[in-house]
Curated annotation (Swiss-Prot):
It is found in: Secreted. InterPro entries: FIB_ANG-like, Fibrinogen-like_C, Fibrinogen_a/b/g_C_1, Fibrinogen_a/b/g_C_dom, Fibrinogen_CS. It holds the Pfam family Fibrinogen_C. SMART domains: FBG (SM00186). This is Fibrinogen-like protein 1. GO terms for biological process: adaptive immune response; blood coagulation; hepatocyte proliferation; negative regulation of T cell activation; regulation of immune response. One of its GO terms (cellular component) is extracellular region.
Amino acid sequence: MAKVFSFILVTTALTMGREISALEDCAQEQMRLRAQVRLLETRVKQQQVKIKQLLQENEVQFLDKGDENTVIDLGSKRQYADCSEIFNDGYKLSGFYKIKPLQSPAEFSVYCDMSDGGGWTVIQRRSDGSENFNRGWKDYENGFGNFVQKHGEYWLGNKNLHFLTTQEDYTLKIDLADFEKNSRYAQYKNFKVGDEKNFYELNIGEYSGTAGDSLAGNFHPEVQWWASHQRMKFSTWDRDHDNYEGNCAEEDQSGWWFNRCHSANLNGVYYSGPYTAKTDNGIVWYTWHGWWYSLKSVVMKIRPNDFIPNVI
């Protein structure tokens, strides 16, 4: 009887040992499977991010060569008042988009600079002299230029500037570069352009930056009365609203907010750096390079004063 009992104990012990071993193996297998699941979940999340990026890029019908289908098509999701709204809706790729400011009767194309903090609506660009900026009132009112190429030159249009800057308070940032690979910027709070009845009058607020305050003419008190562009009306060769006995726009071959005549003219004639001419009609920012140096590139862009980027 004792032998039988011993045999049963041994058999039971062996059986329990095998079951414990099997349970341990099962636990290890479960841990291995959980680790694999976590790894797969991580990979799925990474793929989801990549898919989202690809889908957004897939929406882009943007050809650097200048095809007419260069506007990033966001479909009929919503209408955007400016580029800051597009940026905060998750579109972080710079390029041409359609916007419709609140008072604008129709949408129009504009280049959105999604770098430099994002959400910048580009209102003017000079890059290579390929576009003629010596134009009349209607052209400057409606806008003109290359709205298809990434670095194309254009003026967004005074009507559009008015529609944009009346919907809220905007900051104007001007990026400048010379032919010696140097760059500067000027920034103005509360940039606003009046309506047609007020001849698209310019209003600017507080300055900050590295290029000097050429728009307000604050570089010397004795010249501010004729050099400042603050509250100046827009002028073109065929619509003269400056404070000069002649016609600044005609002499300087561009449309601008001339006084008598300027300490800044970013729509001037494109020269390669230092130049000589009958008048100081180059692309001028006096407080950086004076009147007789024409800049290589200019970007004028605006964004709401209270813009807070959506990082998601």
